[in-house]
UniProtKB/Swiss-Prot annotation:
Quaternary structure, from the entry: Tetramer of two alpha and two beta chains. Forms complex with the iron protein (nitrogenase component 2).
Cofactor: [8Fe-7S] cluster; [7Fe-Mo-9S-C-homocitryl] cluster
Function: This molybdenum-iron protein is part of the nitrogenase complex that catalyzes the key enzymatic reactions in nitrogen fixation.
EC category: oxidoreductase
EC number: 1.18.6.1
Protein name per UniProt: Nitrogenase molybdenum-iron protein alpha chain
A GO BP entry: nitrogen fixation
Recorded name of the encoding gene: nifD
Cofactor: binding details: Binds 1 [8Fe-7S] cluster per heterodimer. Binds 1 [7Fe-Mo-9S-C-homocitryl] cluster per subunit.
Residues reported to bind [7Fe-Mo-9S-C-homocitryl] cluster: H445
Record lineage: Bacteria, Pseudomonadati, Pseudomonadota, Alphaproteobacteria, Rhodospirillales
Range of residues in the leader sequence: none
InterPro entries in alphabetical order: Nase/OxRdtase_comp1 (IPR000510), Nase_comp1_asu (IPR010143), Nase_comp1_CS (IPR000318), Nase_Mo-Fe_asu (IPR005972)
GO cellular component, one term: molybdenum-iron nitrogenase complex
Amino acid sequence: MSLSVNEGVDVKGLVDKVLEAYPEKSRRRRAKHLNVLEAEAKDCGVKSNIKSIPGVMTIRGCAYAGSKGVVWGPIKDMIHISHGPVGCGYYSWSGRRNYYVGDTGVDKLGTMHFTSDFQEKDIVFGGDKKLHKVIEEINELFPLVNGISIQSECPIGLNGDDIEGVSKAKSEELGKPVVPVRCEGFRGVSQSLGHHIANDVIRDWILPKKTEPKEGFVSTPYDVTIIGDYNIGGDAWASRILLEEIGLRVIAQWSGDGTLAELENQPKAKVNLIHSYRSMNYIARHMEEKFGIPWMEYNFFGPSQIAESLRKIAALFDDTIKENAEKVIAKYQPMVDAVVGDAALRAHGTKGRVPLKPLGPRHRPIVDAYHDLGMEIVGTGYEFAHNDDYQRTQHYVKEGTLIYDDVTAFELEKFVELMRPDLVASGIKEKYVFQKMGLPFRQMHSWDYSGPYHGYDGFAIFARDMDLAINNPVWGIMKAPF
């Protein structure tokens, strides 16, 4: 943590002003989730992973979203059934820009929507028979599918359906994995529990009990896996390029553009490299305990973190990999200098004050990419973080930064109104609100239909997109209401 931001601004006073709008009980509860980072603090000073206040407009998702939308959904050669009423699956269909290689309906099924379409009678009498039929139809229509997952919606956990029994029976009948995921939306306080449940299902239903390689698999000393990169806009491909450039072999990449076979390859890796810590640390820890595979978190957002991560990864291998890492960093440095120099010229000497809205696991990695462009983060937070996420956040942000956990729509709008930033980086729910307020905005849950943002090439795209947002001439025509 270095220097401070928001100098001359009474940020604590702003927090108090925003909290004044709440009734006393809600004000006391929300006050625990809002803080201003202090020098030498042991953590960010906010409570996390606690239920949202009923009635507020929260930005969180549910356990179903965490399982299907994040962990399981991008696995491309499996079919993921939204088991329950049609709405949950329909409104989350293709909601994330997980890129794939393959032919839709043949070996790429992630862009398609499958649902058991629960009706009232299914809720009253149970849906196990219907689930049997759905799985049979899927196998008949898509014979090349390598596996099926059952993503439970809320009614499944309420009416006592035996999806585990159905899964075991159909797995034996079809000779393919049929995986039950108890990710009903009412479980937990956010999508974070859905991540955890999905990780546990991979542990119990997919990972082999033994580590002997399959026939034809040739192990090397440089085998690694990419975990928790969902290939938004091609991010995982950009990360893979760098890892292969330094001499490593990526034997599994999931779940973005991932396959069932890659999941099964996981225990053969020498090191597991995890990008989205919050959503995938559970399975990484399990493999360390079960198979003795070390893991490390890496960050390929922005050149500072890319160089640091490449060196940390290379340190786990021999001198050849270490030398290659330095060569790769040096190779891309001229491009980085050009991108940063151009960004500085375009900024016209102004500070880019970015309140980075809750981005879940993405919050922490993205911060330094803004710093690399010479921008200041004046406010940031998570929507589904745990305490350890905030502990890991401290060295990324500066003293005086506004920290908010599970920020409500009202709070975020008021903070933006009072702090008047140059750019808001947030999610789709907030995009049009702030654009109508006359503020530059980037939708950072799916890179605003751009990307990739990982890697050196991704940093150039990131810098271009931030420049286009901030320096768009339309903002000279529109005026913010404040």
